[in-house]
């Protein structure tokens, strides 16, 4: 079990690391701007990782996600909306913890929003490639062998850690659990991609409007403390409750 998991994660880390280093060296020599190099590195490394996973799973007689799983049935608008709102509620619940992190971590997120290709990468490219990789390959492969809880947990933790930024790690792991539930429940990458894209679009728009990822709901409602605590308490209860329901549903599929 652990050999498979470590091999899959190592493939991702090594390929992304080596390809990114190669692109920055080649791009720098060719005089390419940093935004373009970052975009090519991100897209190229994920495409190579996906290809490597297909080869590895075929060798191990696994069943990687096929393109036909992009569109499947059993997907209701209510479930997609609930999943998106759960991510928002969990994000609000984690704000006090996230706000304690150094400003430099917020600056790196702001830089992504200001990137020339920021909107394209965040709202379109990232949801497609990341869901195809983490849910469609890593989660599905592990679920087929070890069950839904192992598949979702490992894929979610890896999904969070691969972001690198402590802020994104804290928020991406629970987000990954929600997205893992969506994929497991619907067997549709399209559903997971949609929720991921909706969340990224919401976050991108909020940061663009507010001017910084470091501005919290608490900051915005500084003069309306009662309203803030009502929203915050509700978000904690709804987010934790929804996440618990999703986890219990996943456990039933073990």
What are these regions (language model features)?
Residues 7, 11, 82-86, 121-122, ...:
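Alpha-helical transmembrane segments of MFS and MFS-like solute carriers/permeases
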Residues 26-39, 62-132, 139-140, 144:
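Juxtamembrane helix-loop-helix connectors linking adjacent transmembrane helices
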Residues 11, 15, 86, 147-150, ...:
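Alpha-helical transmembrane segments of multi-pass membrane transport proteins
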Residues 116-254:
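Transmembrane helix-loop-helix hairpins at the membrane interface
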Residues 15-27, 48, 52-56, 89-101, ...:
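Alpha-helical membrane-inserting segments
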Residues 1-69, 76, 201-254:
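N-terminal, membrane-interfacial amphipathic/helix-forming hydrophobic leader that caps
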């Amino acid at each position: 079990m652990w050999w498979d998991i470590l091999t899959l994660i190592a493939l991702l880390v090594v390929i992304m690391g080596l390809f990114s280093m190669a692109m920055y060296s080649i791009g720098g020599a060719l005089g390419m701007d940093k935004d373009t190099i970052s975009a090519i590195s991100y897209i190229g490394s994920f495409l190579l990782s996906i290809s490597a996973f297909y080869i590895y799973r075929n060798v191990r007689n696994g069943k990687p996600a096929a393109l036909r799983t992009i569109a499947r049935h059993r997907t209701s608008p209510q479930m997609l909306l609930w999943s998106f709102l759960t991510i928002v509620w969990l994000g609000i619940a984690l704000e006090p913890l996230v706000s304690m992190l150094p400003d430099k971590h917020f600056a790196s997120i702001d830089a992504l929003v200001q990137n020339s290709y920021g909107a394209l990468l965040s709202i379109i490219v990232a949801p497609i490639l990341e869901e195809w990789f983490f849910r469609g390959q890593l989660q599905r492969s592990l679920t087929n062998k070890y069950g839904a809880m192992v598949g979702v947990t490992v894929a979610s933790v890896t999904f969070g850690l691969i972001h690198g930024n402590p802020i994104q790690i804290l928020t991406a792991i629970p987000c990954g659990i929600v997205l893992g539930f969506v994929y497991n429940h619907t067997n549709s990458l399209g559903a997971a991609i949609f929720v991921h894209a909706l969340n990224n679009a919401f976050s991108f728009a909020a940061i663009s409007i507010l001017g910084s990822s470091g501005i919290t709901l608490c900051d915005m409602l500084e003069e309306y403390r009662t309203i803030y605590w009502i929203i915050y308490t509700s978000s904690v209860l709804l987010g934790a409750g929804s996440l618990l329901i999703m986890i219990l549903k996943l456990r039933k599929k073990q």
